Amino acid sequence: MLKMKKRLRLLVFAMMIVALITVQLPLNQAEAAPAFAKGTDISWVPGLEAQGYTWKDKNGTTKDIIQILKDDYQINSVRIRVFVNPSSNYANGYLDMNRAAALAQRAKNAGMSIMLTLHYSDSWADPGQQTKPAAWNSYTFQQLMDAVWNHTRAVMTAMQAKGVTPDWVQIGNETNNGMLWNDGKATVSMQNYAWLVNTGNNAVKSISSGTKTIVHLAGGNDNALFVWNIGGLISNGATFDIIGMSLYPSATDWSAKVDQTISNANDMIARYGKPVIISEIGLEYNQPAATKSFVAAIKTKVRNISGGKGLGVFYWEPEAPPGYNGGYNKGAWQANGQPTIALEGFLN
C-alpha cells in the first residue's frame, strides 16, 4: 500500500510538471491555412458597426458581413490590421490589439484563416508615412527593437487569449522604404530595416513557430522596387517567409498591371525562393464589371504560379460604403447596403 501511494504521488507530481511545461510552451502551429487564400481585409468592420452600419447580401437580406463574404463569395481568409496606440477615430485608428483580436476570433469562428498586419504605428503605415508610435519617439534603436519585440508578442498573446493563432503576420505594412522612420528607413539604413524585420519575425515565431511572416510592399508590378527592397533585406540577413504585394490598377490598365505583377512574382520566387501573396488589391467602386474581371484574372494567375508558390489574393476593405473616410471608392458595396458584382471574381 505504501509503495502504491508513493507511485501515485510520483505520478501526480509528474503530471503537474508536464502541465506546467505545456503552459509555458509557445503555440507551435498556426491554424490550417487554405490551399489558396481568397481573402478580404475587413479591418474597418468594427468601426463601421460602431457607427450603425449593416450589410445586405445580393438579395437584400441583412446578414453578418463575414458570413456574406464566406457564403456568397467563397472568401476563406481575412486580413486585420493592428495599430499600437490608436485614436478613437473609427476610420483612421480604433483597431488596437484587443479589438483586432475580437475581430479575429469572430472570423475564426466563421471558419476563416487569419492574416495580421502590424503597422507599428498609431495610425496608417504606407509608402508615404511610416511614423513611429508616439510612445516610441524618443527611443534609441535598441529600445525600438525591444518595443517591436514586445508589441509583436503582445499582439500574438492577445490573439492566443481569444483562441486564434494567425496563419500569417505582416511585419509592417507597405514598407517600400522601410519602417519606423527614420531609424528603419531603408534609404537611411537597410541594415536597421533588416534588424527590425528580424525582430518582428522572431517575436512572432517565439509564440507560434508555424505562423508565416510576410514583408509587404506596394506597387506589385514594380520589379525594380522589389529587387532593391527584398534583395537589400536578404543581403542584410533579414529572415521572413513570404513576399507580399499590393496592386491598385485602374479600369483601363488592370490587365497589363496584373501581367507585370505576375512577372514580378515569378522573378521574386526565382531570385529568393520565397512564395508570394497578394496582400491588397482594389479597383474603382463604380467599375464593378472591370473589378470582377480584375479579381478573377489576378486570382487565377496567382493560383497558377508554378509549384504552388502563389499563396492567395486579398481584396482591401470591400465592405466600405462609397466615399468612406473622406473618399475611399474601391469598396464593393453600394450605398443601399447591397454588394456590387466585384467580388464575384473570387468564385471558383
Features from the language model and the residues they span:
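Bacterial N-terminal signal peptides that target proteins for export
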Residues: 2-15
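C-terminal segment of classical bacterial N-terminal signal peptides
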Residues: 19-29
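N-terminal substrate-binding region of glycoside hydrolase catalytic domains
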Residues: 33-113, 119-148, 154, 170
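Acidic (Asp/Glu)-rich catalytic clusters
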Residues: 34, 64-74, 102-113, 157-164, ...
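Conserved, mostly hydrophobic/aromatic
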Residues: 40, 117, 169, 243, ...
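Active-site beta-loop-alpha junctions enriched in small/polar residues
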Residues: 43-45, 83-85, 119-123, 171-176, ...
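Aromatic-rich peripheral "rim/lid" segments of glycoside hydrolase catalytic domains that contact
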Residues: 50, 54, 267-273, 284-348
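Active-site cleft segment of glycoside hydrolase catalytic domains centered on the general acid/base Glu
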Residues: 90-101, 125-231, 236-240, 251-263, ...
